[in-house]
């Protein structure tokens, strides 16, 4: 054994060939943490010191190659001063460069996923052989960063600037075949032939059949583009990528600028340019929020997986209420492998549900995400029915009938009488109390809420609502079923609106106040979209449905009359009474026309101004900043209340619920991280400036206490530098 550590071993294979193997003890995957980097330094030094070494094969002892850097270390690392961070980055890069500069040929055998630093390790080798099932990529832009272990330097010199820009700026993974096409790898082989192929390649390089030094040289030189080619490649790409990424996600454009700045330099100087730019990105609030988001997401998944120990396996599901929502739920269950009954009392509703499922499956087939055989299998897994005849062996029933407590209670009581005594019943409700609905049931312990978001196939979140009498098994089984459906479940306690809608309606309340103060809703939409929301509040209400918003607002006003009840007629009342219900009937705040793809396209409709005139009670001058604060303060404060009231258990779950459920701007990290980024004390002072607007703008006593103690929700303050 030439070197033995906890993450890396180097052993002799045959005839001077050694294998550097990544196998991080106690972990299911390999990653570049401090330990792995330190051991790579020692391993490279040990190889360099051994005169008998003629060639190096790099491999992995895990199912994956290396998934990248250990992101849990980023939070503390990125707090370091800029100069210290740059020095640390260059020190790490020296390891990869020393590996690249070994006086013998190097081959990496990529057996599974190689992402971020994992791929950058591969790029430092002379040759790359990849398993046909492996995938590679540089996803750092998704964290508000770009590659920092030489990715912006080596990749353009291996696959060309255009291809490298596409890989780095998109952050997408590539298949083995796609990687071969652009020259990122040298050979694709069947998984079982990978080791033999790597051995064959290294032997041919040692024998001189392949010139490894000539292969290595372009990575050490400047980029082979003249001034005109550089201008065409970089300026065009910057414009295109800036348009796609938008101003709130600077990393993709900064990555292109870095490749451009380093184009006329050799490797070592180019790495210095990369390090400076990488650290600049690491210090942005976008990176800190997106890294926080990634860690929150990991925490969420780990927590949801923790319910598996108590959960029953759902082998057969059912959905009550077909139509678009029922069809969407049936599709999601079937396509992920759980057969489902779809029941309704009307044949036409069942047909609508089946059409929805068929349309969604057809869409996947067209995009090549599904084979015709798999589509047929999924369709066969959805069984339509008008009766309860087959409900005896159902493990879990999702009730998805109209959002009316009396109707839901009647349907739930009826289905309870037709299922086994251990069957879980789950109500897909957006606002109605689960404990209230449970009063109609004989076995309330088997009952929970399971709130899907529309459209079901696209929205990743499912709120699993624990009622007063819900058993742990019922909650756990529903969480496990949601995960099986490919969703991200968050368990919340019962209250009107649960987490997401309870927080969303104060946001809509801020919007209604602005319109009543004479602010143009089109302007509000533009300001909030610029702030980072995927759509402004008026457009969002049109998509949700004005009737749905009207009903939800009444439920919330009844649940929280102290702050959510408004005796004045509002913008929602005006549109509802004028039967302008949004996209569903072609007119709401906006009018809707059908585009070439058959999708609704919004257009301004002057007729709406007459509808809104009676609810404009004053004409206020408000700045864009005021618009943001009128909208965001109530949303953030209600999120704080949900955490304090125990509706949601952790700050991470609260923030992820808003990002997954209502499209909260990811680069801002969620409502609580947004408060942290402003500073809790500063946020409280800001809210106090708007105190005249009512109870929704009043910070809680506990938040004031946090402000006075200098506390934060995530134990750190994120600030733009």
Swiss-Prot record:
Residues 312-721 are annotated as: 3-hydroxyacyl-CoA dehydrogenase. It catalyses: a (3S)-3-hydroxyacyl-CoA + NAD(+) = a 3-oxoacyl-CoA + NADH + H(+); a (3S)-3-hydroxyacyl-CoA = a (2E)-enoyl-CoA + H2O; a 4-saturated-(3S)-3-hydroxyacyl-CoA = a (3E)-enoyl-CoA + H2O; (3S)-3-hydroxybutanoyl-CoA = (3R)-3-hydroxybutanoyl-CoA. The keyword Methyltransferase does not apply. GO terms for cellular component: fatty acid beta-oxidation multienzyme complex. The record marks 120, 140 as: Important for catalytic activity. GO terms for biological process: fatty acid beta-oxidation. NAD(+) binds at residues 325, 344, 401-403, 408, 430, 454. Keywords: Fatty acid metabolism, Isomerase, Lipid degradation, Lipid metabolism, Lyase, Multifunctional enzyme, NAD, Oxidoreductase. Its EC number is 4.2.1.17, 5.1.2.3, 5.3.3.8, 1.1.1.35. Substrate binds at residues 297, 501, 660. Residues 1-190 are annotated as: Enoyl-CoA hydratase/isomerase. It holds the Pfam family 3HCDH. PROSITE patterns: 3HCDH (PS00067). The active site is at residue 451. Pathway: Lipid metabolism; fatty acid beta-oxidation. One of its GO terms (molecular function) is long-chain-3-hydroxyacyl-CoA dehydrogenase activity. The keyword Ribosomal protein does not apply. HAMAP family: FadB. NCBIfam families: FadB, PRK11730.1. PANTHER family: TRIFUNCTIONAL ENZYME SUBUNIT ALPHA, TRIFUNCTIONAL ENZYME SUBUNIT ALPHA, MITOCHONDRIAL. Involved in the aerobic and anaerobic degradation of long-chain fatty acids via beta-oxidation cycle. Catalyzes the formation of 3-oxoacyl-CoA from enoyl-CoA via L-3-hydroxyacyl-CoA. It can also use D-3-hydroxyacyl-CoA and cis-3-enoyl-CoA as substrate. In the N-terminal section; belongs to the enoyl-CoA hydratase/isomerase family. Heterotetramer of two alpha chains (FadB) and two beta chains (FadA). This is Fatty acid oxidation complex subunit alpha. It comes from Pseudomonas savastanoi pv. phaseolicola (strain 1448A / Race 6) (Pseudomonas syringae pv. phaseolicola (strain 1448A / Race 6)). The gene is fadB.
């Amino acid at each position: 054994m030439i070197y033995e550590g906890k993450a890396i071993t180097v052993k002799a294979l045959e005839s001077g060939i050694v294998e550097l193997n990544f196998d991080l003890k106690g972990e299911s995957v390999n990653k570049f943490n401090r330990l792995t980097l330190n051991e790579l330094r020692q391993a490279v030094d040990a190889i360099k010191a051994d005169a008998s070494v003629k060639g190096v094969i790099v491999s992995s002892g895990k199912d994956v190659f290396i998934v990248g850097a250990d992101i849990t270390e980023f939070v503390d690392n990125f707090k370091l001063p800029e100069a210290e961070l740059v020095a640390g980055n260059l020190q790490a890069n020296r390891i990869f460069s020393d590996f690249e500069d070994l006086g013998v040929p190097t081959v990496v055998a990529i057996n599974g996923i190689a992402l971020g630093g994992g791929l950058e390790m591969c790029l430092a080798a002379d040759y790359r052989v990849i398993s046909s099932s492996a995938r590679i990529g540089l996803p750092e832009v998704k964290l508000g960063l770009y590659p920092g272990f030489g990715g912006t330097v080596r990749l353009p010199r291996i696959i060309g600037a255009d291809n490298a820009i596409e890989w780095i700026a998109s952050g997408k993974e590539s298949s083995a075949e796609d990687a071969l096409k652009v020259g990122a790898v040298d050979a694709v082989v069947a998984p079982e032939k990978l080791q033999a192929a790597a051995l064959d390649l290294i032997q041919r390089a040692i024998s001189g059949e392949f010139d490894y030094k000539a292969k290595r040289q372009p990575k050490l030189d400047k980029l082979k583009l003249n001034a005109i080619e550089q201008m065409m490649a970089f300026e065009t790409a910057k414009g295109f990528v800036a348009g796609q990424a938008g101003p709130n996600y600077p990393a993709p454009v900064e990555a292109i600028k870095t490749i451009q700045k380093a184009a006329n330099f050799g490797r070592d100087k180019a790495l210095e340019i990369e390090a400076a730019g990488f650290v600049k990105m690491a210090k942005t609030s976008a990176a800190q929020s997106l890294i926080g988001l990634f860690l929150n997401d990991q925490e969420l998944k780990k927590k949801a997986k923790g319910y598996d120990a108590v959960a029953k396996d759902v082998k057969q599901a059912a959905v009550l209420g077909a139509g678009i929502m029922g069809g969407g739920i049936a599709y999601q269950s079937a396509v992920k492998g759980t057969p489902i009954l779809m029941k309704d009392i009307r044949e036409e509703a069942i047909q609508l549900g089946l059409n929805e499922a068929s349309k969604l499956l057809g869409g996947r087939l067209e995009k090549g995400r599904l084979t015709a055989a798999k589509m047929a299998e999924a369709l066969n897994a959805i069984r339509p029915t008008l009766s309860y005849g087959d409900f005896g062996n159902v493990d879990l029933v999702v009730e998805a009938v109209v959002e009316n407590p009396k109707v839901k209670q009647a349907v739930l009581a009826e289905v309870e009488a037709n299922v086994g005594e251990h069957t879980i019943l789950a109500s897909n409700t957006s606002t109605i109390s689960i404990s209230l609905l449970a009063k109609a049931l004989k076995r309330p312990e088997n009952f929970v809420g399971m709130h899907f978001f529309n459209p079901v196939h696209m929205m990743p979140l499912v709120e699993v609502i624990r009622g007063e009498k819900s058993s742990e098994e019922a909650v756990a089984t529903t969480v496990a079923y949601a995960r099986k459906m490919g969703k991200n479940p968050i368990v919340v306690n019962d209250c009107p609106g649960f987490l997401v809608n309870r927080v969303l309606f104060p946001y809509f309340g801020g919007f209604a106040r602005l319109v009543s103060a004479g602010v143009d809703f089109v302007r509000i939409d533009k300001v909030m979209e610029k702030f980072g929301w995927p759509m402004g509040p008026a457009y969002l209400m049109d998509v949700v449905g004005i009737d749905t918003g009207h009903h939800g607002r009444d439920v919330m006003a009844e649940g929280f009359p102290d702050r959510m009840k408004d005796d004045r007629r509002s913008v929602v009342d005006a549109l509802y009474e004028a039967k302008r219900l949004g996209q569903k009937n072609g007119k709401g705040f906006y009018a809707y026309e059908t585009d070439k793809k058959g999708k609704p396209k919004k257009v301004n409709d002057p007729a709406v101004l007459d509808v809104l005139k009676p609810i404009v009670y004053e004409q206020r001058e408000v700045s864009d900043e005021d618009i943001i604060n009128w909208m965001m303060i109530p949303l953030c404060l209600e999120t704080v209340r949900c955490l304090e009231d125990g509706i949601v258990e952790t700050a991470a779950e609260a923030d992820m619920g808003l990002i997954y459920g209502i499209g909260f701007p990811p680069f801002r990290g969620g409502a609580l991280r947004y408060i942290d980024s402003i500073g809790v004390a500063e946020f409280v002072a800001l809210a106090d400036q708007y105190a005249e607007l009512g109870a929704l703008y009043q910070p809680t006593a506990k938040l004031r206490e946090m402000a006075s103690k200098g506390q934060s929700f995530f134990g750190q303050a994120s600030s733009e530098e």
